[in-house]
């Protein structure tokens, strides 16, 4: 089996291309999930203040037999804390029992309140202090990103967005790439594969490679140059989602999956959410 791939970010830091997402997992569930994930080979864990499970993540990491330097931990600044990023980060660090965060993301731009530039400036300072290795955003549209860059001169290293075969966001993905912003996919399986896993192209590729539909979709993300964080608390699925390093999709196969794009957003609209 090939080794799990890593991505070099524009700030020089490196992150695993495949990680474990823990949205909707309780503190208890997340401990077991992370233990399993680390055993399987995951080294990247994606949580958020809004998930209310940072304490569980912290306990799991405290008990882990993996060195901190080998781990890549992401958490996120919630919408209510755009004017107090320092306090929010310190609270997250305390719950996670960590001295620093590998990647701190602003969870949503919340343009109705319009404090996201102020929040970004605060995150820049926290990075300078060494409390954060890398800083990025989630759910930012092109105009939000351009404003951050114009007003601060600092470009996010990551833009984590809803991205799956039904919602491929190719224009935003391309814009991110042009500006050396790595695109990261949340809800990469389209909320459990609804409308994706039953597609003929996905089923045919699963048969061809002896893989599950979920593994085909995860491989599609990887071969499209995306960072991907499928969420699960089920041990068998956590292992299944990581067993994707022994095959690759070719250009024609990626092209067939590209045809599934419907622009179908399953989550909130970033221009409307919050506020």
For the regions a protein language model found, what residue spans apply to each?
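N-terminal binding-site loop/beta-alpha segment at the start of enzyme catalytic domains
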Residues: 1-71, 122, 189-190, 256, ...
């Amino acid at each position: 089996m090939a080794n799990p791939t890593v991505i070099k970010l524009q700030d020089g830091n490196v992150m695993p291309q495949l990680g474990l997402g823990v949205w909707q997992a309780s503190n208890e569930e997340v401990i077991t999930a992370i233990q399993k994930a680390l055993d399987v080979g995951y080294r990247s864990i994606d949580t958020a203040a809004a998930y209310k499970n940072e304490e569980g993540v912290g306990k799991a990491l405290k008990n882990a037999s993996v060195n901190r330097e080998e781990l890549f931990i992401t958490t996120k600044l919630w919408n209510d804390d755009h004017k107090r990023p320092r306090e929010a980060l310190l609270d997250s660090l305390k719950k996670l029992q960590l001295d620093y965060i590998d990647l701190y993301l602003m969870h949503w731009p919340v343009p109705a309140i319009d404090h996201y530039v102020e929040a970004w400036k605060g995150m820049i300072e926290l990075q300078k202090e060494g409390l954060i290795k890398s800083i990025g955003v989630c759910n930012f549209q092109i105009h939000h990103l351009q404003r951050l860059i114009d007003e601060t001169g600092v470009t996010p290293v990551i833009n984590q967005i809803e991205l799956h075969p039904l919602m491929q966001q190719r224009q935003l993905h391309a814009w991110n790439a042009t500006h050396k912003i790595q695109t990261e996919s949340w809800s990469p399986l389209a909320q459990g594969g609804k409308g994706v896993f039953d597609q003929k192209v996905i089923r045919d590729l699963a048969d061809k490679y002896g893989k599950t539909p979920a593994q085909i979709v995860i491989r599609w993300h990887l071969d499209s140059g995306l960072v991907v964080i499928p969420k699960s608390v089920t041990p068998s699925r956590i292992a299944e989602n990581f067993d994707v390093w022994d095959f690759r999709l070719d250009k024609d196969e990626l092209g067939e999956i590209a045809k599934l794009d419907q622009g179908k957003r399953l989550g909130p609209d970033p221009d409307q959410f919050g506020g």
